[in-house]
Each structure stands twice: as C-alpha cells, then as structure tokens.
Amino acid sequence: MLTYKEAGVNIEEGYRSVKLIKEYAKKTMSEYVLNGLGSFAGMVELPEGYKKPVLVSGTDGVGTKLDIACKKRKFDTVGIDCVAMCVNDILCHGAKPLFFLDYIACGKLEAEVSSDLVKGVAEGCIESQCSLIGGETAEMPGMYKEGDYDIAGFAVGIVDKDKIINGKDIKSGDKLIGIASSGVHSNGYSLIRKVFKNLDEDFNGKAIWEELLTPTKIYVKPVLSLLEKFNIKGMAHVTGGGFYENLPRMLSKEGLSIVINKNSYEIPEIFKKLMELGVKEEEMYNTFNMGIGFVLCVEEDEVEEVLKELSKQGEKAFEIGYINAGGEGVCIK
C-alpha cells in the first residue's frame, strides 16, 4: 500500500526538523510571547507604554539569492536576509519589531538544512529584538527539485499612532543621510547570476559566492535609537528597484523630488565589478542599493549630529542628497 513517505513526504524528517528548530526559536522569545512553538498559532501580548498602538506588518523573501545558497550548500545566513528584508521595511514607518514568522518550502526536506535556515532567522530576530513565534516548513515533491529551498517571512511591529513616520513633514531643502549596506543585500540576484557565471572566481581574496551570500544588514537598533533623539521625517529601505523606486516611497506630497550626489560616498567594489562586467550605471541604480541600504530624511541643521550618532554606533553613514522643490522621482548626478 502506498505511503506518504513513498509519495515523497517524510513526516519523521519533519519531526526531527521541528526538534532542531525549537532550540533556536527559544532564544528569541520575549516576555510578551504567551505560548511556545507547537501550538496552532503564536500569541503575543502588546507591550505597555503605547497610548494608541498601531501594528505595522511586512512580508518578503530572499529571491534568487537562495539559488547560490543551494548550489553552495550554505544556508545559515539566508535566514538573516529573510528577517532583514521584513523588519527593515516596517522600520521605515517607525515600528519596533515585535514578532516574526517564517515559511520554508523544499522538494525534499533535510532537517539539518531547515535547521540552518531557521538558525539564521533566529539570529536575525535577536538582532532585530523580535520573537520568532511560529512558521511552516512545507515539503513539496514535484513542486520543487530535490536540493531546492525557498524561504519567506512575515514581521509585525508596533508604533504609537502619533509617532508614525509617513513623510508628511518632508519639505524642500531637507537632507538625506544614507547608511551603508553590508553588500548586495537580497535584490538583483537574477541579474547577478547572469553576470557571474563562475561562482568560484576570485573576488578580493575569496570566492565571489562568499561575497554574494553576505547577509543583509539589519538597521533596527541604530534607527530606533535615532528616533528617540532626532526628528526623522522619512525613511527608505533600498531594496528591489534600487534608488529610483524606493527613495520616492518616503514622500507623501506631490511637487517634491529627490537629488542624489553619487560622489558623496565610495561605491563598494562589488558594484564596481558589476559595472566592469557590463551592467550600465543607470541599471545599477535601478536594481541595487549601490552601497546604501537605508536612507533617512532630516532637517539640514540635524545632519551633523545624526551622522555623529550613527558613527558612535559603528555605522558608516553619509550625507548623500536632498529634497528638491518641483520635478518628480530621483535625479542622480
């Protein structure tokens, strides 16, 4: 008689995976989590101290960066990417991350691989000061090839209604501060995989795949600290669509545009290499973060102090542009 295992789904391996995963998830739990993993749903109590609490949610994945991870069997950092992509998005509205859930899909489940993926998720949650309260691992033979994995996540944060960052006070003359990225982050990998045919080729003394699997930077701690001290008017997470798509998302008014000085900071070597190999500059700014992973909009008289504060926290940051009256979109010059 045909069994589920013979159909390609190994329930015992699933149980073993859950056992390994639980140990990582436990390390992320805050006092606000009301139950552990294994229930039908995760429950989180809202923290005290919020007058009009608003929940802010975001979901994302890692895209085809996972193809490189699968080919090189290096899975312990892409979970960090997954968390970063979600929490950096909700951070743009001033939200402090509360909890996170993940979704892993594969063709054939290997408990050690799913454990490595969740290890990264847990690391990202700890860095983001949020709890991993649940998730789903789906073994789907026929939908995915053996050895292929995918991961996505869902983050929820909290902010007081009167402290939501929505760009409503941004005006002409305000300045833009860019916080450095850790590398390519998690966007543009379909293009990258076309450019770098040989993932083992040398890049500054290491294989290019190692550089490409550098995890996405999480900006939660430095940005939440800034929000307590400065009037941050708008924020943007530079993800898919690069500068051209993401920076205008911080604006809520028509009649304003963004000017970026591309010479205001040193573009990292990985992006220079992509241009050397044939990717045009405009395409680069329309696809990648170009070394700037997160952008803040502040009053001109706060620029120096914000840069000092970021430096104290170990962040590389630069004044990269300004808000302009008239026009639309982004001008890079």
Curated annotation (Swiss-Prot):
Broad enzyme group: ligase
UniProt KW keywords: ATP-binding, Cytoplasm, Ligase, Nucleotide-binding, Purine biosynthesis
Pathway: Purine metabolism; IMP biosynthesis via de novo pathway; 5-amino-1-(5-phospho-D-ribosyl)imidazole from N(2)-formyl-N(1)-(5-phospho-D-ribosyl)glycinamide: step 2/2
Keyword RNA-binding applies: no
Listed SUPFAM superfamilies: PurM C-terminal domain-like, PurM N-terminal domain-like
EC number of the protein: 6.3.3.1
Localization per record: Cytoplasm
Primary localization: cytoplasm
MF (Gene Ontology): ATP binding; phosphoribosylamine-glycine ligase activity; phosphoribosylformylglycinamidine cyclo-ligase activity
Pfam families: AIRS, AIRS_C
Record carries keyword Cytoplasm: yes
UniProt GO BP: 'de novo' IMP biosynthetic process; adenine biosynthetic process
Reaction(s) catalysed (UniProt annotation): 2-formamido-N(1)-(5-O-phospho-beta-D-ribosyl)acetamidine + ATP = 5-amino-1-(5-phospho-beta-D-ribosyl)imidazole + ADP + phosphate + H(+)
One GO cellular component term: cytosol
Family stated for the protein in its record: Belongs to the AIR synthase family.
Stored NCBIfam families: purM
Name assigned to this protein: Phosphoribosylformylglycinamidine cyclo-ligase
Gene source species: Clostridium perfringens (strain ATCC 13124 / DSM 756 / JCM 1290 / NCIMB 6125 / NCTC 8237 / Type A)
Gene: purM
